[in-house]
Swiss-Prot record:
Zn(2+) 2 binds at residues 819, 893, 900, 903. It is an enzyme of class 2 (transferase). PANTHER family: DNA-DIRECTED RNA POLYMERASE, DNA-DIRECTED RNA POLYMERASE SUBUNIT BETA. The gene is rpoC. This is DNA-directed RNA polymerase subunit beta'. One of its GO terms (cellular component) is DNA-directed RNA polymerase complex. The lineage of its organism: Bacteria, Bacillati, Bacillota, Bacilli, Lactobacillales.
Length: 1216
């Protein structure tokens, strides 16, 4: 066998008859499988041991030779080779077909490859292959056209007319094979190339397609006649097994049935030919053989599929590869693995961040081999078998051994669906009682896990390397930041937030206010003995906390704080300022000076002058974590997070917050607000009855009135709320619930959507405290049901989107340090109308500059060229008033099959510059796909008469962008740069005309009457600018402008959708995806190159082809960029393995085989499929080919002690 990690590429071609014979170990002549009495395979049948190898290891069929010592001997009695039984998984047989048979993939596929090669229509081919018509092969001296069809009757008439033997016409696949043999590739290609110079329209399209196929045959060395089979390979029997069930019946693979039909028909045909049977009978048998082979290769492709028992279609060879259950996706890309388990998860609040609790029974099963090895090593058992018995008996001594074995051995925990890379993380196992896995509460957010019955899978990394990678790269404590936006993903939630919120509250006039303590311990003691409350504002000597970064003025003073905040600051990293106010200034700069007083000053007066600070909310805790990470990186941050978690749980327990019905306040003037709304609605309806407004206007006015009433109640609720109310505390802290939940409990439920998505005019006036009437309850069920169905549909859509995104970008890896491009991307803030969707500062952080950034007024250089922009630099640039910056971007990167470090910038998951080998394509796809479930499903009605177009939003809009579809509500764009000189309305055609005049010419654009205009007369417009509201069609923009404009537009559009839903995604992720959509060009004029016109090819391949021609002084080819949707881009990838495992498996493989395509295994997917280590991360060539350390041996002379010198030599070598 070839070592899987050694070969560099894999090629697929058509198999020639001689190749099939060379694979085969013998001909299968009989349709028999297994003898039903002896259960032994029949001779010359589909399971024959002579052909395929023995069924038992090292044993021939008759039993003459047994044991391994006869290895390789062929038994003289039964003819079976003595070898391993697993050769039955690799040895093939063959069937010699008595008549040629066409291969259905090449005849039926779209476009029909046989048809294109012969220049015949697929219908004509079908008539010939299935014996409905004759085809003229050689007209000789008759006036017949070659390749013309003759019916049975016409054939006989022509024979009589011209005499027997005056021309050659045949039917069946044999005829097609003869025609294919006669194809002169070089001559045909020359003719087509001539034709292309003058042809236009449909004729040109066809010529390009034919040329493509013929050229593929010529370049690959495949012969066209191999598309017709004379010999059929039989796949190894263990890949189409037959097993005995309990009841003595057999379960067999469908392929055996399909092969049996082929063999039966082939044998019958052989007999008929021997007997010289009448032509019509032989013809019929040949047709049936053709149909049998078609069904074997791709059942159901032509006509009705062949069915088995219960009219179930049989699974043919093609079906074995296709779809989610096919070979690619079921067995090659997603295998089940050993050393794994799954169980329900429960919360483990006492665990450290890098730990997880594993039940004892589970651990002993998972680590069994390790425990057994240790048992034998300690001489507790004589051999492995005894050790295994010991473990299975549950001997007391195994538990201590297990404890030692799992120490320092990380395990992986995974929760399905794994939407992003944080869905699998490594933990150190801790043995626990019970049967549930224990999970640290802070990692729940990354997994999107909760403890209402979720299950998780556990995996054990076995090799030293796997353990090292799990520990260094995947440990949960390392994953503080979310790869999609670089923000902390492990923010505390629920109880932890509530506890810290309660702890940091301040209260005026609580017991012990104004007491001054000498240090932390004294303050805590006073609190524990009831002299002061957690919320009491007290003084504490600054000198008692020498480790905090105080300013010189603040030292030796007394600081006003609360006991709660003293405890809260206890857990903070030492170098952070003492936190009193929940704001950034306090966190990043220093504790505000107003809280300090001189010893002897009146503390009560100072306290009275200070306003009460709001407590620390979830958002503030997130900022503290981000700042801690920025300063101290992972180790300190994860330790701090554990302290924060413990403190939060402890104090939310002590606070003992409860919720009762009395905690939901009653709004005093609710009745008045609702009455006023009723009157207003009555007035609106009156006006409508008088004909003062349209139905649409009335509907909008009524719904607006009720919406305003609900908002008025909400506003009243917020004004009158008591900050100590437990529900308010939960809502305000960000622990649970939001204002809309609160207003449904205490205000009114408001308007509901009907099943058709239109909002009903009758609102629900009650709230949950008062309780709903039966009718109101019924109304509210519509919304609930719609919510459930939407979520279910959205999950599926979002998952499929992620799959397509991953597929198109999986081969984008950081390949080099710097590509040395001379282009950059000029960026500004992204705006949507007047609103800023994404600020310039956000877009700058973590990118490299292309040119240096200068201060717009003073001209001083703020950031040098090719420099990584940090948060502080970005703030400085924006503060200086800079509005646009040229940065290095993925769009302009020149690296082949990937990106370089400088064009990418920082890795958002670590906050450091990205490493070579990082699989940024997959990360980008996950970052865009994972929040997909949070996007809405519906297209919004903008309401009113203002616009007749629905603006697509949410998930459908993202799909529209990435699939490069024509958008709904398309905007009209101008092709001319210049000034809008006139806008005329034409009431007869209900359109408007916009006239744009520029230096290069003028344009006249027809716009629908109802469209909202974006421009006015006198406006300056650029090429490709939208004249009306709506989305621009990207393909149209590409025709008018350049690639970069389209890329920038798509980037902005994606960001608008996500940001409007409150989801932040780093620009670079979208850039990676959009670049993949624009990586191909279509050849327009081949010039002196040997490219074919109309071919789609990678930009890098195109420039290579031109480079050589330009150097030798020829005419280079011209091309134009093509924008492809992600599905199409995935199928057009250079790797046929990746494309075939994505969609349209048979089409991709047919095409690849004709072209004799080579897969250079550059992406991740193709390497996973063949079982090679992926070429990203630690699997990259530059990290793998490291020589072992060479040790110089020093000769030691007896009697004199010598220190041996060890020199380390480590030289990385690269394959390329």
């Amino acid at each position: 066998m070839v070592d899987v990690n050694r070969f560099k590429s894999m090629q697929i071609t058509l198999a020639s008859p001689s190749k099939v014979r060379s694979w085969s170990y013998g001909e299968v002549k009989k349709p028999e499988t297994i003898n039903y009495r002896t259960l032994k395979p029949e001779r010359e049948g589909l399971f024959d041991e002579v052909i395929f190898g023995p069924t038992k290891d090292w044993e021939c069929a008759c039993g003459k030779y047994k044991r391994i010592r006869y290895k390789g001997i062929i038994c003289d009695r039964c003819g079976v080779e003595v070898t391993r039984a697993k050769v039955r998984r690799e040895r093939m047989g063959h069937i010699e077909l008595k008549a040629p048979v066409s291969h259905i993939w090449y005849f039926k596929g779209i476009p029909s490859r046989m048809g294109l090669t012969l220049d015949m229509s697929p219908r004509a081919l079908e008539e010939v292959i299935y014996f409905a018509a004759y085809v003229v092969i050689d007209p000789m001296d008759t006036p017949l056209e070659p390749k013309s069809l003759l019916t049975e009757r016409e054939y006989r008439e022509k024979l009589q007319e011209y005499g027997y033997g005056s021309f050659v016409a045949k039917m069946g696949a044999e005829a097609i094979q003869d025609l294919l043999k006669r194809v002169d590739l070089d001559a045909e290609i020359a003719v087509l190339k001539e034709e292309l110079k003058s042809a236009t329209g449909q004729k040109r399209v066809k010529a390009v397609r034919r040329l493509d196929v013929l050229d593929a045959f010529k370049k690959s060395g495949n012969k066209p006649e191999w598309m017709v089979l004379n010999i059929l390979p039989v796949i190894p029997p263990d890949l189409r097994p037959m097993v005995q069930l309990d009841g003595g019946r057999f379960a067999a693979s469908d392929l055996n049935d399909l092969y049996r039909r082929v063999i039966n028909r082939n044998n019958r045909l052989a007999r008929l030919l021997e007997l010289n049977a009448p032509g019509i009978i032989v013809q019929n048998e040949k047709r049936m053989l053709q149909e049998a082979v078609d069904a074997l290769i791709d059942n159901g492709r032509r006509g009705r599929p062949i069915t088995g028992p219960g009219s179930r279609p049989l699974k043919s060879l093609s079906h074995m590869l296709k779809g989610k259950q096919g070979r690619f996706r079921q067995n090659l890309l997603g295998k089940r693995v050993d050393f794994s388990g799954r169980s329900v998860i429960a919360v483990g609040p006492t665990l450290k961040m890098y730990q997880c609790g594993v039940p004892r029974e589970m651990a002993i099963e998972l680590f069994k081999p390790f425990v057994m090895r240790e048992i034998v090593a300690r001489d507790l058992a004589g051999n492995v078998k005894a050790a295994k018995r010991m473990v299975e008996r549950g001997d007391e001594r195994i538990w201590d051994i297990l404890e030692e074995v799992i120490k320092e051995h990380p395990v992986l925990l995974n929760r399905a669906p794994t939407l992003h890379r944080l869905g699998i993380q490594a933990f150190e196992p801790v043995l626990i009682d019970g049967k549930a896995l224990r999970l640290h509460p802070l990692v729940c957010e990354a997994y999107n896990a909760d403890f209402d019955g979720d299950q998780m899978a556990i995996h054990v990394p076995l090799s030293e390397e796997a353990q090292a990678e799990a520990r260094l790269l995947m440990l949960a404590a390392e994953h503080i930041l979310n790869p999609k936006d670089g923000k902390p993903v492990v923010t505390p939630s629920q109880d932890m937030v509530l506890g810290n919120y309660y702890l940091t509250m301040e209260d005026a006039g609580r017991e012990g206010e104004g007491m001054i303590f000498k240090d932390h311990d004294e303050a805590v003691m006073a609190y524990q003995n009831g002299y002061v409350h957690l919320h009491t504002r007290v003084g504490i000597a600054v000198d008692s906390m020498p480790n905090k970064p105080w300013t010189e003025e603040q030292k030796h003073k007394i600081m006003v704080t609360t006991v709660g905040k003293i405890l809260f600051n206890d857990i903070m990293p030492e170098d952070l300022p003492y936190l009193i106010e929940p704001n950034n200034a306090n966190l990043t700069e220093k504790t505000p000076d107003k809280y300090f007083l001189e010893p002897g000053q009146d503390i009560q007066a100072v306290i009275d002058n200070l306003e009460i600070n709001i407590p620390f909310k979830k958002k503030n805790l997130g900022n503290i974590i981000a700042e801690t990470f920025k300063r101290f990186r992972t180790t300190e941050t994860s330790a701090f997070l554990d302290r924060l978690k413990d403190l939060g749980y402890y104090h939310s327990t002590l606070a003992g917050l409860t919720v009762g019905i009395a905690d939901i306040p009653v709004i005093d003037n609710k009745a008045e607000i609702i009455d006023a709304a009723h009157h207003r609605v009555e007035d609106i309806n009156k006006a409508f009855r008088r004909g003062l407004m349209t139905e649409e206007d009335r509907y909008v006015a009524v719904t607006t009135t009720w919406r305003e009433a609900k908002e008025a109640l909400e506003k009243r609720l917020i004004e009158t709320q008591d900050p100590k109310n437990p529900i308010v505390m939960m809502m305000d802290s960000g622990a649970r619930g939001n204002i809309s939940n609160f207003s449904q409990l205490a205000g009114m439920r408001g308007l509901m959507a009907a099943p058709n998505g239109r909002i009903m005019e009758l609102p629900i006036l009650s709230n949950f405290r008062e309780g709903l009437s039966v009718l109101e309850m019924f109304f509210s069920t519509h919304g609930a049901r719609k919510g459930m169905t939407d979520t279910a549909l959205k999950t599926a859509d979002s998952g499929y989107l992620t799959r397509r995104l991953v597929d198109v970008a999986q081969d984008v890896i950081i390949r080099e340090d710097d590509c040395g491009t001379d282009r950059g991307l000029t960026i500004t803030a992204i705006t949507d109308g007047k609103e800023v969707t994404e600020t310039l500062e956000e877009r700058l952080i973590g990118r490299y500059t292309k040119k240096s950034i200068k201060h717009p007024e003073t001209g001083e250089i703020l950031v040098g060229a090719d420099t990584l922009i940090t948060e502080d630099m970005a703030a400085k640039v924006v503060k200086a008033g800079v509005e646009e910056v040229t940065i290095r971007s993925v769009f302009t990167c020149n690296t082949r099959h990937g990106v370089c470090r400088h064009c990418y910038g920082i890795n958002l998951a670590t906050g450091d510059a990205v490493e070579v080998g990082e699989a940024v394509g997959t990360i980008a796809a996950q970052s865009i796909g994972e929040p997909g479930t949070q996007l809405t499903m519906r297209t919004f009605h903008t309401g009113g008469v203002a616009s007749n177009t629905d603006i697509t939003q949410g998930l459908p809009r993202i799909q529209e962008i990435f699939e490069a579809r024509n958008p709904k509500g398309e905007a009209v764009i101008t092709e001319v740069k210049g000034e809008v000189v006139a806008i005329e309305e034409d009431s007869s055609t209900r359109t408007k005309k916009v006239f744009v005049k520029g230096q290069t010419g003028e344009g006249e654009y027809v716009v629908p009457f109802t469209a909202r205009m974006k421009v006015e007369v006198g406006d300056e417009v650029a090429r490709g600018a939208a004249l009306t509201e709506g989305s621009i069609q990207p393909k149209r923009l590409l025709e008018v402008r350049d690639t970069l404009s389209v890329e920038t537009y798509l980037l902005a559009e994606v960001q608008k959708v996500y940001r409007s839903q409150g989801v932040e995604i780093g620009d670079k992720h979208v850039e990676v995806m959009v670049r993949q959509m624009l990586r191909k060009v279509r050849v327009m004029d081949p010039g002196d190159t040997d490219l074919l016109p109309g071919t789609l090819m990678d930009i890098s391949d195109f420039t290579d082809a031109n480079k050589d021609i330009v150097i030798s002084g020829g005419i280079p080819a011209t091309s134009r960029p093509v924008l492809m949707g992600i599905t199409k881009a995935s199928l057009e990838t250079n790797s046929f393995l990746s494309a075939a495992s994505f969609q349209e498996t048979t089409r991709v493989l047919t095409d690849a085989a004709i072209r004799g395509k080579k897969d250079h295994l550059l992406g991740l997917k193709e390497n996973v499929i063949i079982g090679k280590i992926i070429p990203a991360g630690t699997g990259m060539a530059r990290y793998r080919n490291i020589e072992p350390l060479a040790v110089n041996e020093v000769e030691i002379i007896e009697g004199t002690p010598v220190d041996a010198e060890v020199t380390e030599v480590s030289t990385p070598t690269t394959e390329d």
